[in-house]
Every structure is written in C-alpha cells, then in structure tokens.
C-alpha cells in the first residue's frame, strides 16, 4: 500500500464533475440541494491552489490553455497544487489542432467550471515551483503530521471495526506483518479503505446482512 495511492499513480488530471440537469434531478428527488454543482464547487475550490500556465515555457503551437479564473479561489488556502505542465505532449498538441480543424473548438472555460463538452487543456496536480506531482500525501498528510500529533501506521491493514454495547465504534483491530492488535478511538472511526475494502470491512464487522459475508 502506498500513502496517497491513487493521487500518486494516476494521470494527474484535475477536473470538476459535470454540471448537468441530471444532478439537479437527483437533488430534487432526494430533497437535498447539496448535491448540485453550485453547492459542491466551493469544496473543489477549497482543496486547490491554482497557478496559471507559464506561456513562456509552454510556447508551443496549439498549446495555449483556455480556462475560467472564477473556477478557482486561492483565498480558501487549498493545499493541492493545480496548474498546467510546462511540457506539452506532441501527440496531444497535434490532437488539439485536429479538433480545431474538425470544427470542435476548445472549451473557453476549460474543464474546471462544470462543462466537460468539447476539448480542453486540462489542469494537472503539478507543483509549478519544482514540476513535481502534488498528491494527497504531499499536500494534506505532511502538513497534518507537522501540525498535529498524528501517527501513521505503515504496512498495516484494518481487519475489523470494534463496537461497544451501544453500537458505537470504539476502535479497530489491525494487522501489521501478521501481528494483530487494537487501535482505540477517542471520538470516532472513519472508514476510508477504498471502494472494495470499505464495504468488506463493514461486513466483517457485523454492519450488514450476514448473507453478504
């Protein structure tokens, strides 16, 4: 397991989700307007610190990014570095020209304002100061470790959530290199073990139908 796993290995693309009518219908059906794009946009803005493209270094034909500055808000102090790379892939550069020739222009607002139609130079999770990848580990975890008393247990996997008689989570049974022990919780247990392990962990902890185990 790698700390910052997905953001450490993915393609570094940083886009918002689409602002569509389907989101509004979903919000209306469940009676919760917090699912709409305008409600979620501030959270996207809160996480990121945007740096405009360096056009001097990106001085390549068809490589000028179009974006909507209002999609970003650096006053919120987001730790995740978001910018445009200084190097441009020649194949993508050619694709940009091909889209224009086919009458498919680049989106004037990019892919950070809720519209994902057409083409766009996409923002990336790259720190422009040193051109390194900005991950959940480098942008969030390192600051948290320095500012709090957080302890990271590496090479450790949760095997069961523990509950008291009142069905309140009190800790987690974990395994480190075959050694089983318990980590106790003072306030709460946050389940964030991935799309597969999170439900599996809940099931083995008795929080689902026995038939699913």
Predicted regions and their residues:
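Structural core of flavin- and non-heme-iron oxidoreductases
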Residues: 1-213
